């Protein structure tokens, strides 16, 4: 990439505005991607815009401060003296309501401070207003979609899906045939806002996003080209340019994490593909009856397990479970997931099927058992189970003793589980090939640099 550095030595008038969504796992991967671009374009100015809370978190833990990236704090949209109503989505809705004007205000500050007009907008794909804003500034617009290509296509097709389902209630929608290469979908498989909860601010934002993304100079996505060619082709037909610049856990700098609970050392003591790893992410915990069912299933099946557990396991798990399973299981408050999934002892990952977790499974070559909760997780489960055939969803999307034991025995002990393992290893090889020099993701990243910094 050194040729870019040589070419860009004179490009000190370029100014890239980066607009980050402050909730969930959105801002961190966008910053990682921008840091990688900024490293290749040291004379280009990058202004990173996000809320104070998120900026404080992102930049306080960053070990590498690049001189050409400066962050600016954007108002979070909460009114003065705000008191939470108890609705966890309320801060998101308030941010969305005010974000367009709040971003504009701080962008003006950055332009005045640097003396450089904005030449490119790199935004979270959620920010549909990037199309008009870039046009006003005579700048390029490059949005980043941090989830999978299949879920993005449902948002591009929202009007088509709503037309097909008409005015039916969600429970009356039996099947929807809309994603190429996917089986027919139920309404419950689709992300919120496509045909349900369509009037809430988040759904409105996603609907507008699907309509506006075709105006972008390029749409970058956290994926690689061979994961689903049919979806890839469909998105290519809708956008000016689709750039696969993932998987991010291979293509962007990864923060070093500690293993304070000794998970990797514990795994070293076990045989290949013998351990069940369990984590449902940092947002949702299964309800009490599902936690009980999972604990009882693990105890009965007898597989060794590591469980990254939110909350107090003594309070939330069956009485005596910790004592009875202490030689077989390890329950920790936090686990180095990426490193665990790369460990040869791990045989399956019981997960909520967030997109980052799916990609981490692929890079680790570990099949998955999915218990989806919300968002794109239902679609991700269908992708891994029915399309890629590298995992299985629990029956009816609920953790019961029967559904868990069935899924564990299928993935860990059956011939079908062995076939899943073979398929995900092939997909892993494709992911690594994509990020090699002249690989599809590597070449798309080169194109991304050219667009953003020229």
From Swiss-Prot:
The gene is UGT78G1. Catalyzes the glycosylation of flavonoids at the 3-O-position. Glycosylates the 7-O-position if the 3-O-position is not available. Also able to perform 3-O-glycosylation of anthocyanidins. Belongs to the UDP-glycosyltransferase family. Myricetin binds at residues 89, 155, 192, 202, 375. UDP-alpha-D-glucose binds at residues 335, 337, 352, 355-357, 360, 376-377. It is an enzyme of class 2 (transferase). This is Flavonoid 3-O-glucosyltransferase. GO terms for molecular function: UDP-glycosyltransferase activity. Induction: Strongly down-regulated by wounding or by methyl jasmonate. UDP binds at residues 25, 282, 308, 334-335, 352, 356-357, 360. The active site is at residues 26, 124. InterPro entries: UDP_glucos_trans. For the flavonols kaempferol and quercetin, a significant activity was also observed with UDP-galactose as sugar donor. The reverse reaction (deglycosylation) is observed, but not with formononetin 7-O-glucoside. Keywords: Glycosyltransferase, Phenylpropanoid metabolism, Transferase. Its EC number is 2.4.1.-.
